[in-house]
Curated annotation (Swiss-Prot):
Taxonomic classification: Eukaryota, Metazoa, Chordata, Craniata, Vertebrata
Gene that this polypeptide is encoded by: ESR1
Domain notes: Composed of three domains: a modulating N-terminal domain, a DNA-binding domain and a C-terminal ligand-binding domain. The modulating domain, also known as A/B or AF-1 domain has a ligand-independent transactivation function. The C-terminus contains a ligand-dependent transactivation domain, also known as E/F or AF-2 domain which overlaps with the ligand binding domain. AF-1 and AF-2 activate transcription independently and synergistically and act in a promoter- and cell-specific manner.
Region: Transactivation AF-2, residue numbers: 312-595
Stated family: Belongs to the nuclear hormone receptor family. NR3 subfamily.
Residues at which 17beta-estradiol binds: E354, R395, H525
Coiled coil: none
Matching Pfam families: ESR1_C, Hormone_recep, Oest_recep, zf-C4
Protein name, as recorded: Estrogen receptor
Keyword NADP: no
Chain intervals for the UniProt region annotation (Disordered): 144-175, 259-285
Length: 596
């Protein structure tokens, strides 16, 4: 068998062709070089992938054009001689390249693949060469290079490092999931909350802003329409809207935990006491929730042992009569003539002081204090004006055509005309008072109706989908049934027949719907007076007004008078279900000064 020897010129041309095919752009999907015989011993087995790469330190100018004839090789790189042609090239035209240690760095070198692929060859200008040769069973093909993978000589260490990275990743993932459960966000700007400040979860920025606003200058003006977006990035753009949102989410001046008032000694004492029961201290947010919102177990236990359900009708009547608030006198000066501002000032001042006594009255209504704090506040916010109005109508029964706001403040319809929009409300109140007078309403029936208004005001929270519903609806319904049975007992005790009892009960309960209608009218009128700055509203009255706006439908107060400055429409009081918590927690309502 004879072996054809190639000349030096043909060998050089063949090498040039291989090099040009490797470096030319990818003009066709696959380049196959037919093989006539098995590869030499330097070539790898066809079942194993072979990677063409360039050793580190090799330099090659890719921008230089390839010569037309043949590339210039150093004599030390490819020593062609008469006796070396057969050793350098095989019969198939590809032959075996010289060993790597016998040649200088060349642009084309065949390397055996290490356990991990070598890092790809870097272009002299810092760009990665996007192609390498890969051996397949069908031949050699030019493929696009993948992302760089760096070779580590010790595969065992690499596996161990992978296990450590996997373990650390899983640990970090579990820690992240654990911390995500406890992550809280600021109710004002949605930034990460630093704690429970002024009654809500808030960040340090909103906490400091609210503190400055309630302690110093807070006469902010919105340059737009009091509807600026307050978030993490835009919370400093409008101080007026930021303060408005602080009040809307429930921030309040008195929203400070009791356990913070004693200073460091109380804190250490609390931690020491907690350490006796458990190793970890209770978080501040949980302490706040435990202080303000009774746990479900405590609530269930309280409802089970609630004494109101075991009261007789006579005991219920006695308790309601004893809970009645004291008589309050107004600051009316007979020597001063009435004007719109003076009359509204008298009425709002009187209403504000009545609200304080109303809170104490509600606490003494049987079954009311058994409710969760959220339910107590919610019911008062929904019913406060109805309760004031039914008290006004009851006092005015003996004064036809007049309304007895206080023992020293008796107004008729003509005097009510000095306040714009007041006559319509006057007429409705006078008509209801006349209806009570026709029915000869008794004092025992009056206290029952007033308690029904309180407990029934927020049972159906269909006015706003953003509010949290009542937590103790079942207990409220049971107390309402108890008071209704007391009403029926009073009618039976008065000698009415069963049919008369049913008719009178229906008539009394139907009148309550008129109080709801009058209350809505009164809220709209009070809100318009606030927008026109006719009279400054007092703290508690303002809070209750803003809270009622939060509970009311979206179109409530949406059309203020045209001459109203839009900057005055922002609520300046607390407009959440936490607006009365200050009076419950600190007992401020009990110590509030009043004129009796």
């Amino acid at each position: 068998m004879t072996m054809t020897l190639h000349t030096k010129a043909s060998g050089m041309a063949l090498l040039h062709q291989i090099q040009a095919n490797e470096l030319e752009p990818l003009n066709r999907p696959q380049l196959k070089i037919p093989l006539e015989r098995p590869l030499g011993e330097v070539y790898m087995d066809s079942s194993k992938p072979a990677v063409y790469n360039y050793p580190e330190g090799a330099a090659y100018d890719f921008n230089a054009a390839a010569p037309a004839s043949a590339p210039v090789y150093g004599q030390s790189g490819l020593p062609y001689g008469p006796g070396s042609e057969a050793a350098a090239f095989g019969a198939n035209g590809l032959g075996a390249f010289p060993p790597l240690n016998s040649v200088s760095p060349s642009p084309l070198v065949l390397l055996h693949p290490p356990p991990q692929p070598l890092s790809p060859f870097l272009h002299p200008h810092g760009q990665q060469v996007p192609y390498y040769l890969e051996n397949e069973s069908s031949g050699y093909a030019v493929r696009e290079a993948g992302p760089p993978a760096y070779y580590r000589p010790n595969s065992d260490n690499r596996r161990q490092g992978g296990r450590e990275r996997l373990a650390s990743t899983s640990d970090k993932g579990s820690m992240a999931m654990e911390s995500a459960k406890e992550t809280r966000y600021c109710a004002v700007c949605n930034d990460y909350a630093s704690g429970y400040h002024y009654g809500v979860w808030s960040c340090e920025g909103c906490k400091a802003f609210f503190k400055r606003s309630i302690q110093g200058h807070n006469d902010y003006m919105c340059p737009a329409t009091n509807q600026c977006t307050i978030d993490k990035n835009r919370r400093k753009s409008c101080q007026a809207c930021r303060l408005r949102k602080c009040y809307e989410v429930g921030m309040m001046k008195g929203g400070i935990r009791k356990d913070r008032r004693g200073g460091r000694m109380l804190k250490h004492k609390r931690q020491r006491d907690d350490g006796e029961g458990r190793n970890e201290a209770v978080p501040s947010g949980d302490m706040r929730a435990a202080n303000l919102w009774p746990s479900p177990i405590m609530i269930k236990h309280t409802k089970k042992n609630s004494p109101v359900l075991s009261l007789t009708a006579d005991q219920m009547i006695s308790a309601l009569l004893e809970a009645e608030p004291p008589i309050i006198y107004s600051e009316y000066d007979p020597t001063r003539p009435f004007s719109e501002a003076s009359m509204m000032g008298l009425l709002t001042n009187l209403a504000d002081r009545e609200l304080v006594h109303m809170i104490n009255w509600a606490k003494r209504v049987p079954g009311f204090v058994d409710l969760a704090l959220h339910d107590q506040v919610h019911l008062l916010e929904c019913a406060w004006l109805e309760i004031l109005m039914i008290g006004l109508v009851w006092r005015s029964m003996e004064h036809p055509g007049k309304l007895l706001f206080a023992p020293n403040l008796l107004l008729d319809r003509n005097q009510g005309k000095c306040v714009e929009g007041m006559v319509e409300i006057f007429d409705m109140l006078l008509a209801t008072s006349s209806r009570f007078r026709m029915m000869n309403l008794q004092g025992e029936e009056f206290v029952c109706l007033k308690s029904i208004i309180l407990l029934n005001s927020g049972v159906y929270t269909f006015l706003s989908s953003t509010l949290r519903s009542l937590e103790e609806k079942d207990h409220i319904h049971r107390v309402l049934d108890k008071i209704t049975d007391t009403l029926i007992h009073l009618m039976a005790k008065a000698g009415l027949t069963l049919q008369q009892q049913h008719r009178r009960l229906a008539q009394l309960l139907l009148i309550l719907s008129h109080f709801r209608h009058m209350s809505n009218k009164g809220m709209e009128h009070l809100y318009s007076m606030k927008c026109k700055n006719v009279v400054p509203l007092y703290d508690l009255l303002l809070e209750m007004l803003d809270a009622h706006r939060l509970h009311a439908p979206a179109n409530f107060g949406s059309a203020p008078p045209e001459d109203v400055n839009q900057s005055q429409l922002a609520p300046t009081g607390c407009t959440s279900s936490h607006s009365l918590q200050t009076y419950y927690i600190t007992g401020e309502a009990e110590n509030f000064p009043s004129t009796v």
